[in-house]
């Protein structure tokens, strides 16, 4: 098991493959993704690497974090993520991960925070059909209707799909294909859509279920 990378979502575009077919892709950019620390079994009880990406202003960095960055001999980072790895995949502190970490054709799992939509009704949030247009229905055409409660159990069950805050949740999209990489510009082109807004931080890992596909 090897480390993933921290990337920044640039946006979507399309490219043409060798067969002349256009493929919708999301462009992810690696911005100084470096190893900040190691976690070892002897010292921490597990093996992992801590990565940092982007650039943070020194004035916005705590004194403790400035010490960590200085120990790793790297500039302050805007985003930090820890990846569990096998012992033979530990990397030296300060080493940089580039777009060549992945290769065209392989499958990856991409994690990001979805775009927030604010307070949304049941029709938009859960794709409910709504109530009837007429025949006794007034004002509440787009409501979710009954919540299914009676004297017994006398409550609304947890997880009941209702109106509420939509988006702004952590989502992982699995088995996306890497169309191509550009190591000089630090770009990874992934087939399809990726959760998150432009400029948001994205975590890219080797797909865990690729063998099943």
Curated annotation (Swiss-Prot):
One of the protein's GO biological processes: translation
Its job: One of the primary rRNA binding proteins, it binds directly near the 3'-end of the 23S rRNA, where it nucleates assembly of the 50S subunit.
Complex and partners: Part of the 50S ribosomal subunit. Forms a cluster with proteins L14 and L19.
Cellular component terms per the entry's GO annotation: cytosolic large ribosomal subunit
Organism: Allorhizobium ampelinum (strain ATCC BAA-846 / DSM 112012 / S4)
Posttranslational mods: Methylated by PrmB.
UniProt keyword Ligase, yes or no: no
UniProt entry keywords in alphabetical sequence: Methylation, Ribonucleoprotein, Ribosomal protein, RNA-binding, rRNA-binding
Keyword Ribosomal protein attached: yes
Modified residues (N5-methylglutamine): 151
Protein name: Large ribosomal subunit protein uL3
Family: Belongs to the universal ribosomal protein uL3 family.
GO MF entries: rRNA binding; structural constituent of ribosome
